[in-house]
Amino acid sequence: MKLKHLPFLAVGAALLSEGALADTEQAVHELAQGCYAIQSSVNGDYLKKFHKGGAIDDGLSYRFEDIQVSDAAHFFFKPTKFKHFLLTDKDGRYLASHLPAEISAGRYAGEFAEWEITAKDDGNGGYGFKFRGTGLDMGLKHNYSDGGLYFFDLLNPNNNDSEKKFKLVAQTDCTPFPEVTTNVTGDVNVLKGDVNDPIRGWADPHTHITSYEFMGGKFMHGDPFHRWGVEAALNDSSEIHGPNGSLDLIGNIYAYNDVNHRYNTEGWPNFPDWPAYNNLSHMGYYYKWMERAYLSGLRMVTAAIVENEVLCWAQSTINPGSWVNPNSCNIMDSIRLQVQRLNEMQDYIDAQSGGPGKGWFRLATSPAEARAIIADGKLAVVMGVEASETFDCGIKDQCNRNDVEDKLNELYDLGIRTIYPTHKFDNQLGGSRVENGFINVGQYLSAGRFFETKECDAHTHGAYFDSGFPLLGDVPFVSDILDIIGLNPTYDETIEHCNQHGLSGLGVYLVNRMIDKKMLIELDHLSADSATQVMDIIEARNYPGVITSHSWMNSGKNGSLHPNTERLFEVGGFGAPYNGNALQMESKVGRYLDIIEQTPYLNGVGIGSDMSGLGGQASPRSNADVDPLTYPFTNEFGFTFEQQVSGNRVFDLNADGIAHYGLLGDQIEDMRQRNSNRVYEAVMNSAEAFMQMWERAEAAPTTKYHDPLEAFVKIFNREANKCMDIPGEDNNLVNGANVQLYKCMDNSYDQQWIWNKEREMFENRADRSKCLDNRGQAYNGGEVVIWDCVDSDNLRWTYTNNVLASKHNPNIVADAYDTGNDGNVGQWEYHGAKWQQWELRPMSIEFKWVDWRDKRSGKCWTVQNGTAANGAKVILDSCAATDAQTWMYDPVKDRMHSALAGDFCMDIPNGNTSDGTQLQIWECQDGNPNQQFLKDSNRFYSVINGNKVIDASGEADGSPIVMWEHHGGNNQKWRASLH
């Protein structure tokens, strides 16, 4: 036997045999991107390709032979994930396996070409390596008596004369695995710095790195990374887009306004038609493209997880390519999957770079963590959510405060730090910024109604709307949807439209809880009213953690910034305009600076790319032909950039614009050379500005919950279980319009009223100039209508103990004549029956002073005798609008506060939840479980015992309020009412 080692290289030249490795796992990780020959540890033979015969893989396989290392197969080690590799020789053949259990020189990447590698210290300063085939889940063995490779041998069951640990000998002449190149040279160590120093570099707060998984994973073609490499990540898109893009219906409509647009779907290595700045349905974030941008000074990005249930449904319905194994269209499922993908991407890049923590792409969940990542010369990635029905709170969903709380906590625990309350469509959190055309069709499919609009105010630029859908009727699948809907909305085509819906009570709760958790609130995509109300909360709570990341807030008139955008900067929030080319960015960044420069905050403005999220990218500069960006160029960090090469395709900013994310690195240099110093410096200060904003948010003092919404109520009839309503769709508020009963609907504005106690009038939300009117008909059969809110007793009412009485005669009260939908509301002499009993139910109850009435009797929780002292008992009593009957529920601390003087809360004596234990009030104590009740729908559960609820022991005045086992009776159901 002749041993053939060069200088002894058990695991690879000087790199792996000098004792620099901390452990055997790191020895495996550091094989990444290496070039090695595989040597027998027993006889020194080397693995070599040979012609074995047969049809599989052209009859080529590998075996050990007594040869020099120069004649051996030299394998490039390409990681697929931690400790797993593809091994390719100089001819591009894979060390592979196939059924039943054979070795071959494979032609394709895949599980049968993937190897899990482990290492063991050989005791001589090196390592022996084991190879386990993923596809067969078997370990590789070498029979050194004949040179053969095998997994199992029926004729040699004891593996005699066999070994399973091998040496790796470093080489320098491997053919690299196919890969996109950054085409950037320089010392990456220059990106490192001191964590206490200001960050130099730019921020992109709006990326969609994982959008390849949204819309069921069947719309955005291409992956930012792939286990089997670029050939799989950026392959031909015809599988989901059809021949020549014929099935890319949504992409063609969005990008080209032409469902019949066609293009070449070929990807790697030629890329004839994609990626392109105006193509919306192909991935632009391949990790090597992102690495080029990172080398330009990109220091942080927000990875906005995007999903839209309606578009997902549409894509999975109309595109046959989506019918096989699509992802779930559920928003929360999609968010969880995309968070998983971001973690996998971090691990994949780490694997390429030599092991955990070695890569340049790092997820960050706090500003301190982000600063440490950046100081280490790496890219900080913050995770956010931009989805239409986050928390499963679409208009059609069953969604309540507990759902929002639980799922907000889940998202936080997943690492999410930024959230858009709305996106594209209205949801139960609030109204979204409205759009005409296809998005309005989606709004109907999502919410069951088209956008409900009003004329924008004097400060707000809105959208023009067409009645019907004149531009969409010829689009095949859209016309089918319109036929199914059978509706054509009518709009005033002469005005600018804004959404009439603002933030909901649930949205108010979300924003406050995000502030409590120091999360960052995104204002883009909110309706103007929603954004105003968010800013009201932000300002009231002195909280700076607010962002506009890609110019999707309403603008002001004549292209000016909206007052809400100005308010955002004035409180210390962060902004980034939607990206444009260098010429466009001068004004886009400049108008943000006009406001920021008047504040005490750092003059930093980011770039919001919104790539691969149904947003087009910057085209080439209009003067690029006469004044091009010249290649190569050296950026301010000393990196030299050549034109980017992906396979056979050369990308040039001057001709291609922002075709993929890597070309943002070229644009940064273009801005450096062509923009004013004011603008360029603001962009290069943007990562620091983002961090300072985030740090201010984390350091913000704890402040009280703030609700900016007016106290709208629904006037609820206890007999009919329906609400006062005006016939029509919030559009029939004319003098004399009859008041009727109808099923209570949270989004029906004409069912919502402001109880103006001073004027004793009920103003209707759909038209605040109209009030509930008794017509002066204080007699049996008198009408109840709406009328202009003039100074007249005809519009005045008194409200006491569930009774709405005419100001003209307190014995004449509002009466439900019929209990069905469209049942008439009139006036009748008081007799006390339930059809004369009305509750003023607030649209939200969190942190509001209300009384609580049981469904059975309509009577109120009452502190007995109004005694403001520890141990005072709680009873049921007729509602009389006293402090003893007034309570405020704190859903954050799960406490019910009494309005009596002092600071008292509902309390279970000694924590005794036995049936019949009477409740009391006691001095409020943080964290005391005796005072904690979970509100679920209309019940209050004790946190001590989830089977016990607050219960009215009787119907008579003075009946004790007790704890009792939940049975679902009406005496355990509680409704809030204003008084």
Predicted regions and their residues:
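Bacterial N-terminal signal peptides that target proteins for export
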Residues: M1-P7
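Residue-level detector of alpha-helical hydrophobic segments embedded in or interacting with membranes
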Residues: K2, T185-G186, A805
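Extended, charged catalytic domains and RNA/DNA-binding interfaces, predominantly
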Residues: Q171-D707
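Bacterial N-terminal signal peptides
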Residues: P7-L15
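N-terminal signal peptide c-region/cleavage motif recognized by signal peptidases
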Residues: S17-G19
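Lectin-like carbohydrate-binding module/patch detector with strong preference for beta-trefoil
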Residues: D23-E179, P708-H979
